[in-house]
């Protein structure tokens, strides 16, 4: 009886402890749920956005382990022994000489002629030894690169040999002063328009105004250009020497397009040069095997950017990528040009002979045409790729396209980087599967698989419970036996078929 009384007296204390435990559980649940609601309400996201607003992001997270990042190349240091070019506006384009020269060339579209028909200082290029444009170079510092640039512009880019509207100054010390009359030619200056169209294909956007879409309004032998769209039709193209400092941002792409221009008009098939000679450079510049690293001068931001052998293997397998072309140019610059820095003529000749085997001319010309057609194109400067933050693996970098003078936003090619992220996952899973297959014996894997299949089948059969004989109510279950055609036990225990309820 005393125990019962003691138990009843302890009930309030037990209830008090239960209430305390319940309060603790409720408090923990409220705190956890409160933090969850606080994280989902967007307050922390707003504070993070306000802190990071106005700052540039080098990468964008795609999921918990993949991010979208990029690398930007400094092409001006890649080919410092070649002419670099840039466009200041729709009427002025500049070429500057290599790093060891001081000359520059200015290409200007204008409607004002600087050549006086009665002046004796100007001569027709067609009368200068079959149109030898090198006779127009009177800069006195000469140089093989300048003569090559003038000849390439005149013969291979402009596709004119004895253009009747081309004149230049031939006075000693007069510098370079060449004028092309774009209005001379049949049917309203078609020669001039072809000349400008070819030059615009090399220079690219914003040179769409150089082409000038106009209609011929011909009456008899007189033709006038009317309804010009997309730009003004200029009358003269003037090439003259100038200084090149601080005009605009220079790039060698126009020179590369110029070197490929002859190939674009040729029907001779060619084959890209084969494999890379990549090696990995450490922080001290020593070469170690295992991949390829871009040196600090080759990229815009400070530091060393490395790509593993998987990316380089993709370039060896597929040549139809702008990034692979750029890597070939870097490799060419490091392994060939560095031995010819003192001989500009030899290095230039080597570049002309090997450029067609280094990069895909179809990609370069295709991007040039996209540039003229106002379609997003590749300028071979900025490339995006997917980076795995855990393993450090990269996808094959893709060109970050340019439109209207600026790079596209990430959302404009979202499908592309999502697809690359998925492909990177697939490659990682495939590699893990191959490694696992290499470490595990194939016979053991087969035994494990078929044993699992056997176990699954037996579980299914056990659940079904296939009947083997009838049970007659009131009698014991017979031993295992066969069943006759009358569904009776073959053991003879049941001799007559009874009309009873069967179980």
From Swiss-Prot:
The chain crosses the membrane at residues 18-33, 447-467. This is Pre-glycoprotein polyprotein GP complex. Residues 34-58, 468-503 are cytoplasmic. Residues 2-17, 59-446 are extracellular. It comes from Pichinde mammarenavirus (PICV). GO terms for molecular function: metal ion binding. Zn(2+) 2 binds at residues 469, 471, 477. Belongs to the arenaviridae GPC protein family. Glycans are attached at residues 89, 111, 181, 241, 379, 387, 404, 409. GO terms for biological process: fusion of virus membrane with host endosome membrane; receptor-mediated endocytosis of virus by host cell; virion attachment to host cell. Zn(2+) 1 binds at residues 57, 481, 489, 491.
């Amino acid at each position: 009886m005393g125990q019962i009384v003691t138990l009843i007296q302890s009930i309030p204390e037990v209830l008090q402890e239960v209430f305390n435990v319940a309060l603790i559980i409720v408090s923990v649940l409220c705190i956890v749920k409160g933090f969850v609601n606080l994280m989902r309400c967007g307050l922390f996201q707003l504070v993070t956005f306000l802190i990071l607003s106005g700052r540039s992001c080098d990468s964008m997270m795609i999921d918990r382990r993949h991010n979208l990042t990029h690398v930007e190349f400094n092409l001006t240091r890649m080919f410092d022994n070649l002419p670099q070019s840039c466009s200041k506006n729709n009427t002025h384009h500049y070429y500057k000489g290599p790093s060891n020269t001081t000359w520059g060339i200015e290409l200007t579209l204008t409607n004002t002629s600087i050549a006086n028909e009665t002046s004796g200082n100007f001569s027709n290029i067609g009368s200068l030894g079959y149109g030898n444009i090198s006779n127009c170079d009177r800069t006195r510092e000469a140089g093989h690169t300048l003569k090559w640039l003038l000849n390439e512009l005149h013969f291979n880019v402009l596709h004119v040999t004895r253009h009747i509207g081309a004149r230049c100054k031939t006075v000693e010390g007069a510098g370079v002063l060449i004028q092309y009359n774009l209005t001379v030619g049949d049917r309203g200056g078609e020669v001039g328009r072809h000349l400008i169209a070819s030059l615009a294909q090399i220079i690219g956007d914003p040179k769409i105004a150089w082409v000038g879409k106009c209609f011929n309004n011909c009456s008899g032998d007189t033709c006038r250009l009317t309804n010009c769209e997309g730009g003004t039709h200029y009358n003269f193209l003037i090439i003259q020497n100038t200084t090149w400092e601080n005009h605009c941002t220079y790039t060698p792409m126009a020179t590369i397009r110029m070197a490929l221009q002859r190939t674009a008009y040729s029907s001779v098939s060619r084959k890209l040069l084969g494999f890379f000679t990549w090696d990995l450079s450490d922080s001290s510049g020593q070469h170690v095997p295992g991949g390829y690293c871009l040196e600090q001068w080759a990229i815009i931001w400070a530091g060393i950017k490395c790509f593993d052998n998987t990316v380089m293997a993709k370039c060896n397998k597929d040549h139809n990528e702008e990034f692979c072309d750029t890597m070939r140019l870097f490799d060419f610059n490091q392994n060939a040009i560095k031995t010819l820095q003192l001989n500009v003529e030899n290095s230039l000749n080597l570049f002309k002979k090997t450029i067609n085997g280094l990069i895909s001319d179809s990609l370069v010309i295709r991007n040039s045409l996209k540039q003229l057609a106002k379609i997003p194109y590749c300028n071979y400067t900025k490339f995006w790729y997917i980076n795995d933050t855990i393993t450090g693996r990269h996808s094959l970098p893709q060109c970050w396209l340019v439109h209207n003078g600026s790079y596209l936003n990430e959302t404009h090619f979202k499908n592309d980087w999502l697809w690359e992220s998925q492909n990177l996952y697939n490659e990682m899973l495939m590699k893990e599967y191959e490694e696992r297959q290499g470490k595990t014996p194939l016979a053991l894997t087969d035994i494990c698989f078929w044993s699992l299949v056997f176990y699954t089948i037996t579980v299914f059969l056990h659940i079904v419970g296939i009947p083997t004989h009838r049970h007659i109510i009131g009698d014991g279950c017979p031993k295992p036996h066969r069943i006759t055609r009358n569904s009776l036990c073959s053991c003879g225990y049941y001799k007559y078929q009874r009309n009873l309820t069967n179980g």
